[in-house]
């Protein structure tokens, strides 16, 4: 009888909260605006929704906003009403059914303010995920119950690890044909090395998905009423009790291995209370030693409310995450300063700009406040440029809608207008403290395309679009190639550049034509090469004199996208004021290699000695000496071309396995693994990007349209000798070198 009463009370309280939600919807969102600014730090969560493409991130976010009363009705990503999901505010996102830009919002659940950033899943927009995770305290890693751990899931996992972001795993799409949450859990453990276990089990999968079993509270949860808003709590079904006991025991064992306090209880063989398990889940999740796994289907409105409870119960508040700033001292190591997350405003404001966007009222800069308080009318300083900015307007964001606020505190995510900055800049109210926060990791572009406006009259709009997009997106580069007289854009993939081309037409009325994709090769040294170069010029009056001696050598393979400059000079043969000139000359020459005209990378320049003239030496002379020294190394050194290698994942029916493997091998792919399940197989391979163009149409034709693939950048690696010869020959022909050699032979 007591169990039935508990269930009825649970139902009653949940239905009352649903009525409260309806009330909030009818009264506008005043409750969200009213309380969002004034919560204690324990009542705040900053989370991201991240996953591989098409795992259901945006649909899940839409359900979260609906159940928390933030929106009045739900819309589908590819819905028949053509409205699109709330967080996909860009017209292109709604048309293509994919998320292109990360979008921020905030909502309330059980008196807790949850700031949410919904991120793209496509590898071409990976920088959006990168900068979102940089400023978040926790994340929900969404996995498809059919696809499981896929290539972009692994990328997101690496990004979470880089920024030490705790996460919950949510296995979505239980309603899909072929869903297998047990297989996804085993992939979480084997492919991603997560100490993971279920805290929920599905009651049926595919079309039989009825609800879920809560292993912590040992009860069944059913989602009833319109849109699954009413939760009915019941006893665990008879046929699932054995499995539930086994999975609960597995959860307890995983927790006891990860948490010392819980492990002691386990060894003492004491019974565990619900509070014991919840406390251990929270401790281990925050320390990233355990990953709780939840289940559901956002599209069918099952599992979202328990996920919201788990976000509050297990993910950290801003006060439980250590955020650091650094003070640079010349000639010394950086000094680490732990920022104070208290929302009392006693310490100076510290914030990090993580995203720029051109809004209707000018440039919109997204920031996370890490310390102190910021109010309208305050002055803040950019730690990189030391420029002062007066705060005229503070806004909080709900997708593409803005809500003005008067102040923001530590832990808040907000936006400013009219701030000239770059992604990763630190802002503070006290410029004298010389503190800055760690910036955002930005991957190098791997694909280039020629671009030109279709009409010459659109050149002004074209320039405006390029200026805006290159500022917003640090992975989108633009430059003019003087040799071929072409304007080039480079980015993370073909889709990345196609999206920007379409945005130029839609947002600036400037249709453009894209050329064929070009791979961003690199050139590097094979072995060390010494140089001793004297630059001497006398043409009346003061001349130029500079001598530099040193060594250029390759960096380790894991650093082959970097350039290093090391000053090893002792004494005054090369005066210290001229060393920056040498470095500038070195970096300028690295913009264009000798073999293929691509950038140099993976090289360390060691300046060891030299000579100067008391009158004729200058920074310019030493810069030109560096130019000459590198030309000398071009002639005397041994060089090779590096190419981007992609991690490729192909899934197709088993009968096409031979054809798929054959095509990957033909494209110089190295198979790294295969797996099969229920008539389908997945093959993992490393393939040069240069060999992947046109693969989509080949895969479609060879698998009768049933195969699909994803790829993401892995690393740069040396080209095969015949590929290098071909690249060098093509470059020489484009420069007219081949023709000149033929003429010499004829003569």
UniProtKB/Swiss-Prot annotation:
It is found in: Mitochondrion. GTP binds at residues 51-58, 118-122, 172-175. InterPro entries: EFG_II, EFG_III, EFG_III/V, EFG_IV, EFG_V, EFG_V-like, EFTu-like_2, G_TR_CS. The keyword Mitochondrion applies. Residues 42-319 form the tr-type G domain. PROSITE patterns: G_TR_1, G_TR_2. Pathway: Protein biosynthesis; polypeptide chain elongation. CDD domains: EF-G, EFG_III, EFG_mtEFG1_IV, mtEFG1_C, mtEFG1_II_like. Disulfide bonds: none annotated. Mitochondrial GTPase that catalyzes the GTP-dependent ribosomal translocation step during translation elongation. During this step, the ribosome changes from the pre-translocational (PRE) to the post-translocational (POST) state as the newly formed A-site-bound peptidyl-tRNA and P-site-bound deacylated tRNA move to the P and E sites, respectively. Catalyzes the coordinated movement of the two tRNA molecules, the mRNA and conformational changes in the ribosome. This is Elongation factor G, mitochondrial. It comes from Drosophila grimshawi. The lineage of its organism: Eukaryota, Metazoa, Ecdysozoa, Arthropoda, Hexapoda.
